[in-house]
Amino acid sequence: MKAYNINEKVTEGEHNVRRGRCILCEAHGVTNYLDKGEGYMVWIPSRGKRIVCNEHYINRGSIGYHSNALRGVSKIGTHKTTTLANTPLGIEVETSLYNASDSEYTALRALVESCTFCYMESDCTVSGEMPTQPMEGLNRISKILQSLEMHNQLSILSHNSCGAHVHVECNRVPYVRRYYHSIFLPLNDYIDSLGAERRIEVFGSDFRYYAMKINENSDPQAHSNIFNTQHAHTLEFRLPRVTGYKQYMNVLKFWREVVCYINHYNFKEDADAVTRKATARACGEALVKIAKKYF
């Protein structure tokens, strides 16, 4: 499949995704139909082709949490210079509006309109999904979730069909794929040992078909793994769902610290195979210690 650059114009005969409508205009409640040649085709890795109008193309910049976060990172939130605070993070929050009240729909629309870092797009499994641009810091998303909880409107994000997956930039993805089981099986087993009730309390949901626990035979790049390595520049945690402001913020901080640890871990890549595997296992054990700080 052809990968489009963000500056490539839609040409005559090119297939217009979403019937030629700017997806960012739609996020603000405006249906903006674009004729052939008027919009810009944007390629969002793992999401596919998307069209934006000229105004949003000029003002928007880099779109998508799957892209290399070093390009066009939106420095939202904290001004701290710690490694942890400056680790780019993105989320994709699924929504369920099939039985939503007018106030819930209005709240979601206001949420999207108030954001310069997320937009609404379609998802075949739910009624909508809000991916964010890479963020440094958690203040903005924290305030949004706190506001929704205060007004008893978190139900639009916590339906049992929804997820709230977390992506954190990782500079060791190829290595993580190679030693996936050594790194993540200890953490997987610890989460499994919590029991269903505690998992739902901590993560907002239990294992399910699109967030499955792993075993020694799991494919490291299987999309449904709770720890997903299929993206080139991020590690994704697929288990969470938003059920509360503090609950989800705790999950974000946990996964950010896990990936930050992996990014700066000395995997001894020049050592022999036995040493490399033992080093990867030691990393996996350290991730469990991180998890125990949070839950």
Name each model-derived stretch.
Residues 112-119, 149-157, 188-191, 257-266:
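A common structural junction motif
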Residues 157-173, 234-238:
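Histidine-centered divalent-metal-coordination microenvironment in nucleic-acid enzymes
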Residues 231-281, 285:
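Modules that initiate DNA replication and primer synthesis
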Residues 24, 43, 49-155, 243:
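Terminal catalytic/cofactor-binding subdomain
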Residues 157, 192-206, 261-293:
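Flexible helix-coil linker/hinge segments at domain or subdomain boundaries
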Residues 3-46:
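Short recognition patches in nucleic-acid-associated and regulatory proteins
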Residues 138-148, 172-199, 245-259:
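Helical (often loop-to-helix) elements that flank the catalytic cores of nucleotide-handling enzymes
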Residues 90, 177-243:
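Aromatic/basic-lined ligand-recognition segments
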